[in-house]
């Protein structure tokens, strides 16, 4: 059975950064349970250690193409936009010291058209993409106070302003997956072509046979529809290009920087819980080999011992990647939630594209 290839990182020179995730703050404006990954989403804590971050980046190897993801509960509010712009200004300085090109990835719930538009206008010379989460009009996503989301209105106005190609739409798989084709069709008619769907990392409904059956039928309808359009469905790249299951994070060349100035290997592992053996202060960046080796020893999932065959499925990233730090053994069997739904997914792709 396929397992994650391990990398040897004995010294700092063995490490080359190609993906950086910076958590700017923890403020979420949505009420759904799956909107944000990092536990406390209303701490108000902002990242302020810019000089220390630059010091680290100057002193480690960086790939000639660096992807920087900026994260928060919601980046695009009037209060947060100055912090986003500052992050981009400061981090661009690294190109003075390193021969690298920066691709920016930013994430949003799409609830403030004016702020997103202003950002896109101000950064037209940058290589940047905004991922906006939208699951259809009957989505579980609500604004706090159980108010309906304004995302669709934002998407309409962004498209009318000429920014559809700067945006990736991310659709979460829930019990309401029956609306996927209709949602993709509505977005396509608005001018959006960059789309993907994703599985929620911890979601018990994936074990329900009716949900799996609904997903299978809806995915089949959606893929047949996509096949006859010029929609760029990112999941299809995984089907065509991957021979083995991959992982959520780029193991061995990624760092996450938290809002309180800690560095670690992968933001997807945490979910609000941190562990001293796989994190270090920004100024202790010489410990990167140590935290990677600890991560490899303690948290990489051993797929060879898995009773869930989904670990051999090339479409799978979330399953069988890493154990969640600080969680019990039952929580860390989350990959079992996806055993059936992931194989249903692959079977649908094979039936249409193989």
Give the label of every model feature segment.
Residues 1-3, 7, 262, 270-354:
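Flexible mid-to-C-terminal extensions adjoining Fe-S/redox cofactors in radical SAM and related proteins
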Residues 1-21, 62-64:
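N-terminal [4Fe-4S]-dependent radical SAM core
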Residues 33, 76-77:
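Aromatic-lined carbohydrate-binding surfaces of glycoside hydrolases
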Residues 194, 203-271:
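A C-terminal junction/extension of Radical SAM enzymes
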Residues 41, 53-71, 78-201:
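Radical SAM/AdoMet-radical enzyme domain recognition
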Residues 27, 31, 35-38, 252, ...:
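Cys/His-rich metal-chelating microdomains
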Residues 29, 75, 111-112, 137, ...:
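Short, solvent-exposed loop/turn segments at secondary-structure junctions
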Residues 11-50:
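Canonical Radical SAM [4Fe-4S] cluster-binding loop centered on the CxxxCxxC motif
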């Amino acid at each position: 059975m396929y397992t994650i290839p391990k990398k040897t990182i004995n010294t700092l020179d063995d490490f080359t950064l190609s993906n950086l995730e910076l958590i700017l703050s923890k403020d979420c404006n949505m009420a759904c349970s799956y909107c944000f990954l990092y536990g406390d989403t209303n701490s108000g804590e902002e990242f302020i250690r810019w000089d220390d971050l630059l010091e680290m980046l100057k002193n480690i190897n960086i790939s000639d193409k660096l992807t920087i993801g900026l994260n928060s509960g919601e980046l695009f509010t009037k209060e947060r936009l100055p912090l986003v712009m500052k992050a981009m200004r400061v981090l661009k300085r690294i190109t003075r010291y390193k021969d690298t090109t920066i691709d920016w990835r930013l994430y949003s719930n799409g609830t403030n058209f004016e702020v997103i538009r202003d950002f896109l206008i101000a950064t037209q010379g940058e290589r940047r993409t905004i991922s906006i989460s939208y699951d259809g009009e009957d989505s579980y996503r609500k604004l706090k106070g159980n108010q309906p989301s304004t995302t669709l209105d934002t998407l309409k106005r962004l498209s009318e302003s000429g920014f559809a190609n700067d945006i990736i739409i991310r659709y979460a798989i829930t019990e309401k997956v029956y609306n996927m084709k209709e949602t993709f069709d509505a977005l396509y008619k608005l001018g959006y072509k960059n789309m993907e769907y994703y599985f929620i990392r911890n979601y018990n409904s994936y074990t329900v046979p009716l949900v799996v059956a609904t997903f299978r039928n809806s995915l089949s309808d959606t893929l047949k529809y996509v096949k006859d359009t010029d929609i760029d469905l990112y999941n299809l790249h995984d089907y065509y290009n991957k021979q083995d299951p991959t992982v959520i994070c780029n193991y061995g060349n990624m760092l996450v920087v938290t809002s309180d100035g800690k560095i670690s290997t992968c933001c997807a592992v945490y979910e609000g819980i941190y562990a001293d053996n796989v994190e270090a202060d920004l100024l202790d960046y010489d410990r990167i080999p140590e935290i990677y080796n600890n991560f490899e020893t303690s948290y990489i999932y051993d797929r060879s011992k898995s009773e869930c065959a989904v670990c051999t499925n090339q479409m799978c990233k979330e399953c069988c990647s890493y154990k969640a730090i600080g969680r019990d053994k039952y929580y860390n069997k989350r990959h079992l939630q996806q055993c059936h739904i992931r194989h249903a997914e692959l079977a649908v792709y094979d039936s249409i594209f193989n």
